[in-house]
């Protein structure tokens, strides 16, 4: 089983990264959050990822995370009934464990619909499963390390700046899921956010689509 990879960054796209180590190049599936944290690195830069090695009847797949905390959160999510690996990865793209705990405690099911293609019964299913297993999430939160590659950024940003950055990333991911190139999505989001104010990513996406 592969539990970690350290090697040369060969290719990076939304959804996956290629890492070369020991003369072998591995394709690793990543969340949009991890993509954003890696995208400013130059190719051939050495990177290290925590790996969850999935093996089932359909084959093998590597899922990569920048921190052990993210990897463990992924394992908690995919272990819930009806939430597979790809849905768990989508959850990580949009929400931290703290976010998810807050959503379930407050009953804000609609918050989960920020995830592309997660609507109605799907969001309700995720909400129900997390609520039924809230103790697992509490144990994860109480035992998880506070170390993270984004802590420094968080300390340097005001709450307003952090909220804006998260909203922007959510809208970009939504556009990417609709088929936009990440660079084009970023450009369109920045353009619309200068003239359109809303805290609802769905409204911002609709405004962008109207302006095209």
UniProtKB/Swiss-Prot annotation:
UniProt main location, coarse: cytoplasm
Ranges for region Domain I: 1-66
Stretches the record annotates as Domain III: 163-212
Gene Ontology CC, one term: Holliday junction resolvase complex
Pfam family, one: RuvA_N
GO BP: DNA recombination; DNA repair
SUPFAM superfamilies: DNA helicase RuvA subunit, C-terminal domain (SSF46929), Nucleic acid-binding proteins (SSF50249), RuvA domain 2-like (SSF47781)
GO MF annotations in UniProt: ATP binding; four-way junction DNA binding; four-way junction helicase activity
Region (Domain II) location: 67-145
Function summary: The RuvA-RuvB-RuvC complex processes Holliday junction (HJ) DNA during genetic recombination and DNA repair, while the RuvA-RuvB complex plays an important role in the rescue of blocked DNA replication forks via replication fork reversal (RFR). RuvA specifically binds to HJ cruciform DNA, conferring on it an open structure. The RuvB hexamer acts as an ATP-dependent pump, pulling dsDNA into and through the RuvAB complex. HJ branch migration allows RuvC to scan DNA until it finds its consensus sequence, where it cleaves and resolves the cruciform DNA.
Description of its domains: Has three domains with a flexible linker between the domains II and III and assumes an 'L' shape. Domain III is highly mobile and contacts RuvB.
Description of how the protein assembles with itself and partners: Homotetramer. Forms an RuvA(8)-RuvB(12)-Holliday junction (HJ) complex. HJ DNA is sandwiched between 2 RuvA tetramers; dsDNA enters through RuvA and exits via RuvB. An RuvB hexamer assembles on each DNA strand where it exits the tetramer. Each RuvB hexamer is contacted by two RuvA subunits (via domain III) on 2 adjacent RuvB subunits; this complex drives branch migration. In the full resolvosome a probable DNA-RuvA(4)-RuvB(12)-RuvC(2) complex forms which resolves the HJ.
Name listed for the protein in its UniProt record: Holliday junction branch migration complex subunit RuvA
Native organism taxonomy: Bacteria, Pseudomonadati, Spirochaetota, Spirochaetia, Leptospirales
């Amino acid at each position: 089983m592969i539990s970690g990879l350290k090697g040369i960054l060969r290719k990076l796209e939304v959804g996956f990264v290629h890492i070369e180590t020991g003369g072998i190049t591995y394709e690793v599936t990543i969340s949009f959050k991890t993509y954003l944290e890696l995208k400013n690195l130059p190719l051939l830069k050495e990177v290290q990822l925590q790996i969850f090695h999935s093996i089932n009847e359909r084959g093998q797949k590597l899922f990569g995370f920048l921190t052990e905390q993210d990897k463990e959160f992924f394992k908690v999510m995919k272990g819930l009934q009806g939430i597979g690996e790809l849905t768990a990865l989508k959850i990580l793209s949009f929400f931290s464990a703290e976010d998810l705990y807050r959503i379930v405690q407050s009953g804000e099911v609609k918050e989960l619909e920020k995830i592309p293609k997660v609507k109605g019964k799907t969001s309700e299913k995720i909400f129900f499963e997390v609520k039924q297993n809230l103790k697992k999430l509490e144990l994860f939160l109480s035992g998880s390390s506070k170390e993270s590659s984004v802590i420094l950024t968080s300390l340097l940003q005001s709450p307003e700046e952090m909220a804006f950055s998260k909203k922007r990333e959510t809208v970009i991911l939504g556009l990417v899921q609709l088929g936009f190139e990440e660079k084009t999505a970023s450009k369109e989001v920045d353009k619309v956010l200068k003239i359109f104010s809303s805290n609802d990513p769905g409204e911002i996406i609709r405004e962008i689509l109207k302006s095209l």
